[in-house]
Amino acid sequence: MTAEKSKALAAALAQIEKQFGKGSIMRMGDGEATENIQVVSTGSLGLDIALGVGGLPRGRVVEIYGPESSGKTTLTLQVIAELQKIGGTAAFIDAEHALDVQYAAKLGVNVPELLISQPDTGEQALEITDALVRSGSIDMIVIDSVAALVPKAEIEGEMGDSLPGLQARLMSQALRKLTGTIKRTNCLVIFINQIRMKIGVMFGNPETTTGGNALKFYSSVRLDIRRIGSIKKNDEVIGNETRVKVVKNKVSPPFREAIFDILYGEGISRQGEIIDLGVQAKIVDKAGAWYSYNGEKIGQGKDNAREFLRENPEIAREIENRIRESLGVVAMPDGAGQDEAEAMDEEE
């Protein structure tokens, strides 16, 4: 760059900073522009690895969608529990009016510290979200769900009234307002969404999500969660085998997958993931039905091995750290939090 151009650029930058404030424009090599992305663990080791950065990125919009009873709300409650372990504050906008507080507590959520709102309209839900984000004091907000964000005009109208595109316009306007503030306040905002079928689609995927296309564009991460099987114990179904696919990721390569178990009344089985990922990484040995670690047997069958790790959290943590090391994923700063969760399991 010539001296004349450099001088003109410096003058332009000075004018922009004077008009819009310091930090409104900067070089990528300066200060916070190159800082590592701050993340919140999902509570699933496999999903943290699939996301590429160790969790869900803060200061971004995340969409989690899937069929009914696929584990969407369970996953977000696990993220809230992980955030609370490191001292964060979370809010849950329950537009569906269906949050089970007792279930949230079982997943490790500190319910007395969780902010909960059950708004009457979509506008009210998004205004509350905007106010919380602008306060700068909230670390994470969950909106459950986009499909339940009913516009005021629809609520006040008659059953059967045709109001095309109303919800999509509401979401588009809200996200235009929210995105910049979310980035500045470093708040993680998760939208839970449902799946609908497009009528008349002959080729391609007929599935789509509610609320228009705005959320697809504004989301930095989109997770597709599906139940792919049942977990049985003595012919009794005790949980679901779940697959999460990272269909969009602006902070790491997308299209990675994670498979984990969700146990009824417990949430994501951390110990089950450690066993599965340990076997894949050849850290845990499997011979027939027996699992062993460092030459010592830890259980016959996955259930017994899971129980062993639950009773020996220090061994579980050691295996987890070795898995992270082998995959090049830095150990999470909230590592101590898992030991607390294991201690809670032992008390139960």
Swiss-Prot record:
It comes from the Bacteria. GO terms for biological process: DNA recombination; DNA repair; SOS response. InterPro entries: AAA+_ATPase, DNA_recomb/repair_RecA, DNA_recomb/repair_RecA_CS, P-loop_NTPase, RecA-like_C, RecA-like_N, RecA_ATP-bd, RecA_C_sf. Its main location: cytoplasm. It holds the Pfam family RecA. One of its GO terms (molecular function) is ATP hydrolysis activity. It is found in: Cytoplasm. One of its GO terms (cellular component) is cytosol. The keyword S-adenosyl-L-methionine does not apply. Can catalyze the hydrolysis of ATP in the presence of single-stranded DNA, the ATP-dependent uptake of single-stranded DNA by duplex DNA, and the ATP-dependent hybridization of homologous single-stranded DNAs. It interacts with LexA causing its activation and leading to its autocatalytic cleavage. Belongs to the RecA family. This is Protein RecA. It comes from Burkholderia lata (strain ATCC 17760 / DSM 23089 / LMG 22485 / NCIMB 9086 / R18194 / 383).
